[in-house]
Amino acid sequence: MSAPLDAAPATDPTARHDGLPRKTASAAGVDPDAVIGFLDDVEQAGLDLHGFMLFRDGAVAAEGWRWPYAAHRPRNLHSVAKSFTASAIGLAVREGLLRLDAPVIGFFPEFAEEARQPGLEAMTVEHLLTMSVGHESETSGAVWRGIKTSWVREFFKIPLAHAPGERFVYTSAASYMLSAILTRLTGQTMHDYLKPRLFEPLGIAGEAWDVGPDGVNPGGNGLVATTADLLKLGILHLQDGAWQGRQVLPPDWVRAATRAQGPSAGYGYQWWVYDDATYAGIGKFVQMVRVYPEHGAVLAVIGAMKGSSRLVPHMNAHFPAAFGVSNPDAAKDARLAARLAAWQHEDAAAPWKAPFQAGQTPAQLRRLRFTATDNAQGITG
């Protein structure tokens, strides 16, 4: 097991705005050539990877962002936000605010009469966590956001096609209800609840979370954060909930959340679980934080590609095989540094990306026209 994360000293020149210490890849026991191979494979496959951070042996061992993306620029996170939601529920359980076997409808008695249907009273908080509420199909975040009335009321209107706990059906509606329950219990949004308990202890700042019609954070998406913030959530779980000497999350919760639960062998409590003893939070367009407990490593990636299944084979081809280098190698580290520098700047000089003078007067600006190539959204300009 590699070294735990310690606070970076204020004078540590390797620490950046995120407060995480840095090492060269080989000093952290990572093969620099494997990282180069990963980037080369992704590029040759035509995958749009925007940035990544790799943590091992108590420090960030490699990182890079492709222009115009950068470390300090936050992203609108999709379903990877669910893993933050799981942390909030774990904290609420520790504080005695709720039990996993508590019926969901019990938190919203005002909907009990209109929501009456067989099986509903058997649906528990744990069924929300494990995506086994009994629905026939997914309710995506995009569908959810089109609803202008109470999302809680709409959730209880969805028919139960299966007994709760019987079948895994991935749905962002379940994550929303976890957030709604927390807000009902605390009077706070999940974001405000997590601020002093998770975000501030981890040095996460500048984050934000959307709010739905009920005054509730979506839970399953809508969190705005950086790649480093994703990495920190993974590091926290790698370390059984400990962060720089403080037990931020209960260790038993971390272990429960990141192993298979409910009817699916590949899903825990809002975390995806793999056969190779790794686990990951995953969001649309390949927003992922993957934890390698047996190797003391965490990999966070941000991209714009359809389906994580396109990137995962390239990850698996190089990680965890890259871990376990025993001797620092300055020459290999220099090759990696050069590759990352080229990756970061290779598009910056493209002629079509150069700044241009749009005009200085209102009349000139009104003459500007922008057009778009064919796209699924039907945007023409």
Feature map (PLM): residue ranges:
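N-terminal leader/targeting segments and the immediately adjacent pre-domain N-terminus
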Residues: 1-75, 91-99, 130, 328-372, ...
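Structured C-terminal helix/loop/strand segments within mature extracytoplasmic catalytic/sensor domains
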Residues: 2, 283-352
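Structural helix-adjacent loops and short alpha-helical linkers that scaffold large soluble proteins
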Residues: 31, 96-100, 138-139, 183-195, ...
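Active-site SXXK
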Residues: 58, 75-101, 128, 178-182, ...
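Active-site helix/loop module of the DD-peptidase/beta-lactamase fold
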Residues: 76, 95-133, 157, 188-221, ...
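A small/polar active-site loop signature that marks catalytic segments
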Residues: 134-211
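Active-site-proximal alpha-helical segments within enzyme catalytic domains
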Residues: 174-181, 219-242, 287-304, 316-318
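Active-site Gly/Thr loop motif
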Residues: 251-301
